Design a protein with these regions (language model features):
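Conserved SAM/SAH cofactor-binding pocket of Class I
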Residues: 1-76, 192-278
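SAM-dependent Rossmann-like transferase core, predominantly class I methyltransferases
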Residues: 2-6, 151-208, 215
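Short beta->alpha hinge that forms the Motif I/post-I loop of the SAM-binding pocket
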Residues: 47, 130, 236-241, 292, ...
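Conserved proline-anchored active-site loop of SAM-dependent methyltransferases
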Residues: 94-105, 212-216, 273-287, 300
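N-terminal auxiliary segments of SAM/dcSAM-dependent transferases
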Residues: 102, 106-175
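A short glycine-rich, Lys/Arg-flanked "PGG" loop and its adjoining helix->strand segment in the class I
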Residues: 109-121, 293-306
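Glycine-centered, small-residue-biased loops immediately flanking beta-strands
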Residues: 123, 230, 308
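Core SAM-dependent methyltransferase catalytic element
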Residues: 159-176, 329, 336-358
Length: 358
């Protein structure tokens, strides 16, 4: 990955540095950084549980290799959205962010604010990104927040930027009030696809239901209200999303809900459900893809009971039907409009061969 090679060439680390990785834990630079800070600490401020698991695996591989020097006790995780709530200010020597891993501008801006809170005076922030991902705008933000920014390297449209936290700046412990959640989860607002999915759902009072990639929880909480004698499990790889969904379940007085961090259905793969729903993302690192949705469909077929129902909402131009037909015997459109379609799939293929099915 070009981004990581640029970081390898430009990020300067001392052996006793405390290094903060800002929502970029899966970057190949991370295990290399761990090898360098043999007397310091590596903090992974990461939101995505799947990427965190990938980072841990890479660090463990590096540790087990001949000559591997990084101690597994010298790195730890803190949820990205809770950094200023859990960590003391002005304790970090170097912070690193790869723009590729940030879902939107809100995450980038929050990362800058966290950096200002976290860095010691004289500490450095390194940001790597592409021009088409907004690295030039990022440079302007860094200049505004820190009063300085330097371009350390340019290669094939990629840049490495560096800002230093000055001895006297606008940052103080009061910036612990920084919050990511309100900017990425609009209170009380349903997107069009979610609304159409909710309208099309058939929910039974006793349903045992699963919401894969629940986000802020609109779909799962709607099901929980209708399945009053059932149980709803909501999953998301985003720790921020899990927190928001849990809070909304508590605020709604819903006791038949559990919300779990999970990479796909990993956390519940041994369980079986009457109803499975998803409104999957179709962008990954800024690139349109059906990879995540297709994975959710295959996993839904593995956890759905033979007589269960699976619902997915998608933009009309996304061709989910071939994957659905490979996983289910019955696939039909049950809702939507000119922009979106709601698909229902039933009778998962080979469902009767799986243990635990009823």
């Amino acid at each position: 990955m070009l981004h990581s090679s640029l970081l390898d060439n430009t990020v300067q680390l001392a052996i006793d540095d405390r290094v903060l990785i800002l929502n970029s834990a899966a970057d190949p630079f991370v295990p290399k950084a761990a090898q360098q800070v043999v007397a310091g600490e590596l903090l992974l401020a990461e939101d995505n549980i799947a990427l965190l698991q990938s980072a841990y695996a890479a660090l463990e591989r590096e540790h087990s290799m001949p000559g591997g020097r990084n101690s597994l006790s010298r790195y730890r995780h803190v949820p990205f959205h809770e950094y200023t709530l859990r960590e003391a200010p002005a304790t970090i020597d170097v912070a690193v962010m790869n723009m590729l891993y940030q879902p939107s501008n809100a995450w980038l801006i929050y990362g800058l604010q966290v950096t200002g809170y976290a860095l010691k005076p004289g500490g450095r922030l390194y940001v790597v990104g592409a021009k088409d991902r907004g690295v030039l705008s990022m440079a302007k933000r860094m200049q505004t927040l820190f009063g300085n920014v330097e371009t350390l390297e340019i290669s094939k449209g990629q840049r490495v930027l560096c800002s230093r936290k000055m001895d006297r700046g606008t940052w103080s412990p009061d910036t612990g009030q920084i919050s990511l959640v309100p900017t990425i989860f609009a209170e009380g607002k349903l997107d069009e696809g979610t609304r159409l999915l909710i309208e099309a759902l058939e929910v039974h009072t006793t349903d045992v239901a699963l919401d894969i990639g629940c986000g802020a929880g609109f779909i799962g909480l709607h099901i929980a209200r209708l399945a009053s004698k059932g149980q709803v499990t909501m999953l998301d790889a985003s720790l921020a999303a899990v927190d928001v969904a849990r809070q909304r379940a508590e605020q709604g007085g819903l006791t038949n809900v559990q919300v779990l961090p999970s990479d796909g259905v990993q956390a519940v793969q041994a369980q079986r459900f009457d109803l499975v729903v998803t409104n999957p993302p179709f962008h990954l690192a800024g690139i349109q893809t059906t990879e995540i949705a297709e994975r959710f469909m295959r996993e839904a077929a593995q956890v759905l009971r033979p007589r269960g129902r699976f619902y997915v909402v998608a933009n009309r131009f996304l061709k989910y039907e071939p994957t659905l037909r490979a996983c289910f015997k019955i696939v039909e459109e049950v809702g939507g409009n000119t922009r979106f379609k709601v698909l229902r799939a039933m009778d998962p293929i080979r469902a009767s061969t799986r243990p635990g099915d009823l």
